[in-house]
Amino acid sequence: MEEHRIYITINHLDDFECASFLKTGDRLILNKERDNIYDDEAIIAYKENKTKVGYVANSVHSVARGTYSAGRLYDRIGDEVGCILKFFFLEEGYGIAEIIE
């Protein structure tokens, strides 16, 4: 049986200073942000030291084709899950990561 991989778009990488220290292959932690007043399916991305680096994209305008939106991912994960940053474009403010369980 073929393994099904889940990829996500992480946005706002350019909004957090620490994002400039990201590198391909970094392990990130995703947490549901239940108290987010703008998006009730918000999922925030952290480095392992709990430094914020971005959010899982949740808009048709920001989700890269072939990746899961935060809304699609929200009910498939627990409160916290890991991911590996596959590549990113810091100037454009987004990256693609693979969910690891």
Each model region followed by its residue ranges:
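Conserved active-site motif detector
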Residues: 1-101
